């Protein structure tokens, strides 16, 4: 499949996502009840391979994220930390081949942007140049402000990510809801403002209280993408494997299951195995045949 895009065919771009912001910044004291049905929330999901990416794209997903969650749900790592740039590039290339309409965002893995900023920008360039990503996602708030600005200066669109940032797993002491105290909530507000000021075109809010996410969403001019952050965000994202019942480990509270693909696979494999062992597969209709002439000549050769 060609990776050339035709904007006239509904290709979603970074400006399109920016234009999907569903409200204007409000007063800090103004409450936000954004549950109206007229909102065009941004639909985001993860993908890690060509067929899944193509299915998501054809289903109308707005943003496809090649998340570093691939390390856990596909590669079997205990967490996202061991994932390398090369592994992420490999999966991003595969997803690129399946995505034509959606905006393709690639996660910057742990260690790829934590040291020298110039090296971090070079790593981000690789995702765009070598793998076809249209944006990268960077975890962190205020402490990543200069880095995000430098990437944006290099014309690399950046999606921010604050709250529960899985790459900070050890610092947080596990996968825990963030922003529950006043001090922590205020820090996340500062983080969100810093990410916006640095030039990010959107920001993921993960595992934070609904009320805090609503406050951040009402203050920012860029779209917020929630994952365990309540319905007031401008969009939502889930790890696909959690949503379709294909995760083998713990499924977060915020992940609604829309299918049980894992169970379907188990049943299908068990049925296949039984048919093979009992000689029921393959059947005649699943087999190829010689013509009668060739069959007779072959039998004659065997008798001679």
Roles of regions detected by a PLM:
Residues 2-25, 33-292, 297, 301-304:
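Alpha/beta enzyme core
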């Amino acid at each position: 499949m060609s990776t050339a895009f035709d904007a006239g065919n509904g290709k979603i771009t970074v400006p399109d996502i920016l234009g999907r912001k569903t409200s204007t910044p409000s007063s800090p004291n103004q409450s936000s009840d954004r549950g109206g049905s007229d909102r065009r929330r941004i639909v985001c999901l993860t993908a890690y391979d060509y067929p899944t990416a193509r299915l998501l794209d054809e289903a109308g997903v707005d943003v496809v994220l090649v998340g570093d969650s691939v390390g856990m749900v596909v590669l079997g790592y205990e967490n996202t930390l061991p994932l390398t740039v090369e592994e992420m590039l490999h999966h991003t290339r595969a997803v690129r081949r399946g995505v034509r309409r959606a905006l393709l965002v690639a996660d910057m893995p742990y260690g790829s942007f934590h040291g020298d900023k110039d090296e971090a920008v070079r790593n981000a360039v690789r995702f765009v140049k070598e793998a076809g990503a249209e944006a990268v996602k960077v975890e962190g708030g205020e402490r990543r402000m200069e880095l995000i600005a430098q990437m944006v200066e290099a014309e690399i669109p950046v999606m921010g990510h604050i709250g529960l940032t899985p790459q900070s797993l050890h610092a947080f002491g596990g996968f825990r809801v963030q922003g529950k105290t006043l001090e922590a909530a205020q820090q996340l507000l500062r983080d969100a403002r810093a990410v916006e000021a640095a030039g990010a075109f959107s920001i993921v809010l993960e595992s934070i209280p609904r009320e805090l996410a609503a406050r951040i969403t009402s203050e920012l001019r860029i779209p917020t993408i929630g994952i365990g952050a309540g319905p007031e965000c401008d969009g939502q994202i889930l790890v696909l494997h959690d949503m379709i019942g294909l995760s083998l480990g713990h499924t977060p509270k915020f992940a609604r299951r829309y299918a049980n693909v894992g169970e379907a696979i188990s049943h299908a494999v068990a049925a296949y195995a039984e048919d093979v062992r009992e000689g029921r597969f393959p059947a005649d209709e699943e087999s190829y045949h010689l013509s009668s002439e060739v069959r007779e000549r072959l039998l004659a050769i065997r008798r001679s």
